[in-house]
Amino acid sequence: MNYKKFYKVTIERQKLARAFLSASGMGELITYIMNAIYVSASYDEFLTMKYLLARNILNCRLYPVSIPAVSEANMKSIVTTIKGTSNLIEFPSRKYNPAGVFQHTDKANQYIIIDTQFDASMDVNVLASAFNMDKADFMGRRVPIDGFGNLDNDRLAELFADDPYYVEITDAEKEALNAIPLALVDENFFMIYDNLNEFREVENGQGLYWNYFFHQWKTFSTSPFSNALLYVPATPAVTSVTVTPATATVSAGSSLALTTEVVTTGFAPQTVTYTSDNDKVTITEGGVVQIDSDATGTATITVKSTFDETKTDTVAITIS
């Protein structure tokens, strides 16, 4: 996601004159200008990062880990689960990142994004021990947020009015997101780039005031190669895998695009793998079947969920 925004603050002549009435006046004026601009810019960046995280969760791109319902009685069990998965992602695995590449995340590179209500009910020292850190080190890798689903849709719509990929998060989706207590991500999960940060000053001679503009151009993304885990008080599951067409007759040397629908619950991943039982028939990760020019006979394409390998579907292809 990208945006090019500017933030404006107006300083009237009287306010500028008052800045020279005391030794600290000019410093206070500069602080006022900076705060007025940077607070707004920081809020937009925070909101965009929350939206990116929420959209990744709703698109089932974080690996879900089931935990008990959040309650005082279940805290020990929840911390045990967090510690176990934090330990697991220190070892190379394809399991915990959307791209399915071998990846690991050391403790020092793990960050926890935590709902403030859950954070208030959790003993920080206990949670820090789950990451084998003292409290001081852990606090630097703990990012509290005011709920995973608390999003300012009006402001987001303004920020991304020209972005065709922006999709507003519904009230039902917000409710599901707010049930999530925490996520654990690699430090490289968020990819944020400052393309331009520039101040401009314009004097208005008629009104005797100055307008200060801060232009900020940013690129926001998340890395599919970074480990990212989501702790959900539910049981993630794959309900079904359905591929269409179920049968097809395809001529040698041509191709066929498959459409795969994966129904899940509990934010379980919707990714699949494709395999063919005919060496002359291959299939891309995007679901496009390619028939070699010298292929003959038939081929069966098997589509399998990466999260639950018992959930599969097949396509029977006859080569003409």
Regions found by a protein language model. Name each.
Residues 61-160:
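Extended, solvent-exposed, turn-rich assembly/linker loops in the middle of proteins
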Residues 22, 115, 185-186, 278:
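Polar helix-capping/helix-linker motif
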Residues 141-236:
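Extended, compositionally biased alpha-helical segments that mediate assembly or anchoring
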Residues 2-65, 212:
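Long, contiguous amphipathic alpha-helices that act as assembly "spine/axial" helices in icosahedral shell
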Residues 235-320:
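Extracytoplasmic soluble-region selector
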